[in-house]
A protein has these predicted regions:
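Short hydrophobic alpha-helical membrane-entry/anchor segments
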Residues: 2-12, 23-41
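C-terminal non-catalytic interaction/assembly regions of soluble proteins
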Residues: 54-100, 388-457
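Short glycine-rich or small-residue beta-strand-to-loop segments that form or flank ligand, phosphate
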Residues: 152-162, 217-220, 241-247, 273, ...
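Accessory alpha-helical/coil subdomains and C-terminal extensions
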Residues: 234, 245-247, 253-272, 283-423
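Long, compositionally biased, glycine/small-hydrophobic-enriched stretches that function as flexible linkers
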Residues: 24, 34, 45-135, 142-144
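Anionic-ligand anchoring segments at beta-strand to alpha-helix junctions in alpha/beta enzyme folds, i.e.
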Residues: 170-217, 419-422
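Glycine-rich oxoanion-binding loops at beta->alpha junctions
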Residues: 109-147, 193-243, 251-252, 278, ...
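N-terminal phosphate-binding or glycine-rich loops at protein starts, especially the Walker A/P-loop
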Residues: 17-24, 55-92, 143-193
């Protein structure tokens, strides 16, 4: 195993989930025997390396009574995601982690290039010849790339608000201090703050001690990632060599451009992207932070809609929840509430006439109905203008909640049902603004710590 594989693997989107994560791996070669057949990890050009069987033609005994007992079946491949590796450009550097001395030898669970997490352990007989992802596990390394005393770190939060942002800021700051990093900046106002000196503030454990009790972001979020060159130059001018960027897809596109600029400038900096989406629509991880809190708050809104719908005759309780491109918040909240009659997701092809007919049938039968719709359904039910975008580059969605309310009342009037009422609830900003619940708080804590471990590795 080349020793360079132990060096820095931090890169854009490096901090992934609680159980899986890591800052990624450089391409390397390994020869390994696994249950009587040979496998080779071959280094490839580009961003991935494939684990392939050499002797796929050999028959293998099935272990146990069910197909899938083995991690890798004949014809399957494991794919490594390869982020940039600072050691490839600046040479190998190894420093003993200060955590050993800090915890007086009590820290034993170090990870290395052999510690992996596979995308799934679930199998069925039809999944032969599929490709699965493989990641290095998150966690502290015994040897790290950076000398922590020479690190200047910066943290920025971008995009919209999400429960748990302050927990992540707090966790990053505290773990950086654990490593002994002398200078930690918090950059206010998102990417736009990089260009303004008064947006760079010093962080320490005392300043972030209680911010996790509050919603929002102590660093203030903002959208937009223009002037990449100017931002990158400002970052380099401050001497930052460890950058933590918390945000969604638009934010990570910006992070990638910043990292590319630094590569061209031959500037040594570990750029770590920490995924933030309240919609939970990242396929690489099981849950994104803030999602569990959002579902809990969404259930409260649904319960209010149910109370309103059942508390008046011929009433429609209509609740709009977040979900730009996916309906995970709606799906989980609806299942948890167990009081919803119709759930509309962005993944569906929705027929408005059929929906209205169903609402009429339900009201005629029971006198009420509860409908929950994801914001992204506006792209299905209405015509969104692809040229209208927000500062983050996302297409602005028409308000499907108000649209549905109006269409329901138009339908009622056309059918002589002037006794119908619609109680419309849009809790979007209330949900985004709350502090993280205990589950999300714990997740953010571990996620932030692992992001620092990955950046140091």
């Amino acid at each position: 195993m080349p020793s360079d594989s132990k060096n820095n693997y931090a890169a854009v989107a490096a901090a992934a989930a609680t159980t899986a994560v890591a800052a990624g791996a450089a391409g390397y070669a390994v020869y390994k025997k696994m249950q009587g057949y040979d496998q080779t990890v071959s280094e490839l050009r580009g961003n991935v390396s494939h684990l392939q069987e050499e002797n796929a033609h050999l028959s293998r005994p099935v272990v146990g009574s069910m197909t899938g007992d083995d991690i890798l079946l004949p014809g399957e491949k494991l794919t490594y995601l390869k982020p940039s590796n600072l050691a490839e450009r600046f040479g190998k550097k190894e420093h003993t982690t200060p955590l050993i001395e800090k915890y007086e030898g009590q820290l034993q669970d170090f990870q290395d290039e052999h510690s992996i997490v596979t995308q799934t352990i679930y199998r069925n007989k039809d999944e032969h010849h599929k490709q699965f992802l493989r990641y290095l596990r998150a966690g502290p390394r015994e040897k790290v790339y950076f000398n922590p005393k020479e690190v200047t770190a910066a943290i920025v939060t971008c995009g919209g608000l999400c429960p748990g942002l302050n927990n992540v800021i707090r966790g990053l700051t505290q773990m950086l201090e654990e490593y002994g990093v002398p200078t930690i900046y918090g950059v206010k106002n998102g990417y736009k703050g990089f260009k303004k000196d008064n947006c760079w503030i010093k962080l320490d454990g005392k300043k972030v001690e209680t911010i996790h009790r509050m919603g929002g972001s102590a660093l203030v979020c903002n959208r937009g990632n223009d002037d990449i060159d100017v931002m990158a130059e400002a970052i380099m001018k401050k001497g930052v060599n460890m950058l933590f960027i918390v945000g969604g897809d638009g934010t990570h596109r910006g992070a990638d451009k910043i990292q590319q600029y630094m590569v061209k400038a031959n500037y040594e900096c570990s750029v770590v992207g920490i995924p933030k989406t309240i919609d939970n629509d990242i396929p690489v991880i099981d849950d994104s932070f803030g999602f569990a809190t959002a579902v809990s708050e969404a259930v409260r809104a649904i319960e209010a809609g149910y109370v309103e719908a059942t508390g008046a005759p011929n009433c429609i309780g209509l609740v709009k929840l977040m979900g730009r491109n996916s309906g995970f918040v709606v799906l989980h909240a609806v299942c948890a509430a167990a009081t919803v009659d119709v759930a509309l997701l962005p993944e569906m092809d929705i027929s408005l006439p059929k929906l209205l007919d169903h609402i009429k049938q339900k009201i005629d039968k029971d006198g009420h109905i509860v409908v929950v719709v994801a914001e992204g359904c506006g792209a299905t039910l209405m015509q969104a203008d692809p040229n209208l975008k927000d500062a983050g580059g996302n297409v602005k969605l028409p308000d499907v909640g108000v649209y549905l309310k109006d269409k329901i009342m138009e339908f009622a009037k056309a059918n002589g049902r002037n006794d119908w009422t619609v109680k419309y609830i849009d809790p979007t900003y209330m949900i985004r603004a709350v502090p993280a619940n205990p589950g999300d708080s714990t997740y953010c804590h571990v996620l932030a710590h692992n992001a620092v471990h990955g950046a140091m590795a």
